[in-house]
Design a protein with these regions (language model features):
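Alpha-helical structural segments
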Residues: 3, 10-33, 48, 52-56, ...
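Residue-level recognition of oxygen-bearing side chains
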Residues: 7-10, 66
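Residue-level recognition of alpha-helical structural elements
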Residues: 43-46, 50, 76, 80, ...
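Short, flexible, glycine-rich and Lys/Arg-enriched loop motifs at helix boundaries
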Residues: 25-50, 98-106
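Short, hydrophobic secondary-structure boundary micro-motifs
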Residues: 69-71
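Solvent-exposed, amphipathic alpha-helical segments
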Residues: 22-33, 67, 121, 125-129
Length: 165
């Protein structure tokens, strides 16, 4: 196998790049769809854009679980070393940007760093499910449920009523 590649790094990227590229294409499309929502609907409409795409995300990742395992467990020293954190950061930025642009008076922004920590937990959970031996339907169902818990929780944290203000 090494005869086809000049280095282990070249082999690593030959295995992992297709999965990452396919995933990022879907995530970029989702973000564009979210950005296209009217400002007034964006915070509460993000889930309506995201949830129908969970099966596509799961399909991309389970199509090559070995590549995903390499990204999660063997990416130290590669361009994918912080890949999960990068995705979490993108999600946190999208949420923070949405909240900053919202005109609703009952919502107050929470620190982007806090949202990023929450997103890191969510993304780590997604990837743990992918590298587990769970079947596609179980992963999709878990991701939908966990996503709704995170969505509801983040919105609750932003609501002034929740904070007693």
């Amino acid at each position: 196998l090494y005869g086809y590649f000049n280095s282990k790094e070249e082999l690593f990227y030959a295995i992992t790049d297709p999965v990452v590229n396919n995933l990022m294409e879907v995530l970029d499309r989702i973000r564009s769809e979210m950005d296209a929502l009217p400002k007034k609907e964006r915070l509460y409409g993000m889930g309506k854009v995201y949830y129908p795409n969970i099966p596509k995300i799961v399909d991309i990742l389970i199509a090559d679980r070995d590549a995903v395992k390499l990204i999660v467990n063997g990416a130290k020293g590669t361009k994918y070393e912080n890949f999960l954190d990068t995705i979490a950061g993108r999600n946190a930025l999208t949420i923070s940007k949405t909240v900053k642009n919202i005109e609703e008076k009952t919502i107050r922004p929470i620190k982007e760093q806090t949202i990023e920590v929450l997103m890191e937990g969510y993304i780590a959970t997604l990837f743990r499910l992918i590298i587990s031996d769970k079947d596609r339907e179980t992963i999709i169902r878990c991701m939908e449920m966990i996503g709704k818990i995170y969505e509801t929780g983040i919105i609750a944290l932003m609501q002034k009523v929740f904070m007693g203000e």
